[in-house]
A protein has these predicted regions:
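C-terminal and inter-domain tail/linker signature
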Residues: 1-146
């Protein structure tokens, strides 16, 4: 696949699997059976298309209106780097935190490796502390000083 085709594959992942209006079954077309996803909020790696679907379900359950916007993509060889912004309303439990109704915004980067037209590995990096602060699970510096 060309670098442009690799970038398009990752756009499909963001728009069709992880955004609220997407189709989870598209994960079967995008992720290889041996897919491994590394995420700072998951103590264990995500595995296979079913693991990607489960991760997407978790975010969709916590943020039914979740939206991911791709800000930039860079591709070289079998790698694609996608810089994204996620937003949504906290309406379901997230990592033991009850719904707050808070609007959240998270900036992140995903580095993906493509093989034979499918994603075989992802490394996600995002502001997990900022997300937990927006959900009220961790005090902000201002709250901690009060």
């Amino acid at each position: 696949m060309s670098t442009e085709e690799n970038k398009a594959l990752l756009r499909r992942s963001v728009e069709e699997v992880f955004s609220a209006q997407g189709d989870l079954d598209v994960a079967d077309e995008i992720y290889a059976p041996n897919y491994v996803g590394h995420n700072p909020l998951d103590p264990e790696d995500v595995r296979g298309p079913e693991g990607a679907k489960e991760q997407a379900r978790m975010y969709r359950s916590a943020f039914p209106d979740v939206r991911l916007n791709i800000e930039e993509q860079v591709a070289e060889g079998d790698r694609v780097v996608t810089r994204w912004i996620g937003s949504g309303t906290h309406q379901g439990e997230m990592m033991g935190i009850a719904p707050t109704g808070n609007q959240i915004r998270v900036d992140g980067i995903t580095i993906s490796r493509i093989q034979d037209g499918k994603v075989v590995e992802d490394w996600e990096l995002f502001n997990a502390l900022g997300l937990m602060q927006q959900l009220g699970g961790v005090p902000t510096p201002e709250e901690a000083q009060a």
